[in-house]
A protein has these predicted regions:
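Hydrophobic ligand-binding cavity/cleft-lining segments
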Residues: 1-50, 161
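Short amphipathic alpha-helical segments
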Residues: 17-23, 139-147, 151
Length: 161
């Protein structure tokens, strides 16, 4: 089994009300508009949300992966997306926890994890076997960190206007 794992976790204080922060993070169009490498997100008739993400890896180049996720939790404390039932190859988990600091300030704890599983490296990309799991995982970690940091920066700017 050829497995690539990557993730990123961070915490940020946003000078906006809990209600506005939750509303922002509940709207998936904000992810498409503000998170780099997200090419599209759509929800099908069965309630499964499909994220299409571009992955750039040195020595290999760019490739696109689709992640099917479902909303596991959405309330005033937390939003969590988990892999859709039956998904075995492209696993994406995203969560945001909301902690009010004051009436006009909210702390948000982010976590995004991705896992790509293939029976053989060539199923992921013809050159994946040459790069190996650790190099690709390391580059994906950098990519996810960059995606989330950029998204959080843009979200903070928009919410604090």
């Amino acid at each position: 089994m050829f497995t690539i794992r990557a993730g990123y976790t961070d915490q940020v204080e946003i000078k906006a009300s809990l209600e506005n922060v939750i509303k922002f993070f509940s709207d998936i169009k904000n992810f498409v508009e503000m998170m780099p490498s997200i090419e599209s997100i759509h929800t099908d008739g069965g309630g499964v949300t499909h994220w299409r993400i571009r992955v750039d890896v040195p020595f290999i180049g760019s490739f696109k992966e689709k992640f099917a996720v479902q909303l596991a939790e959405e309330n005033e404390d937390r939003i969590e997306w988990i892999p859709a039932a039956g998904e075995k190859q492209n696993l994406l988990r995203y969560s945001a926890e909301f902690m009010p600091k004051s009436a006009d300030s909210t702390v948000v704890q982010f976590s995004q994890n991705a896992e790509l599983r293939r029976a053989a490296a060539r199923e992921l990309h013809p050159l994946a076997g040459l790069a190996g799991e650790s190099i690709i995982s390391g580059e994906m970690n950098k990519g996810i960190a960059q995606m989330v940091k950029s998204f959080v920066r843009k979200a903070k700017e928009k919410l604090e206007k």
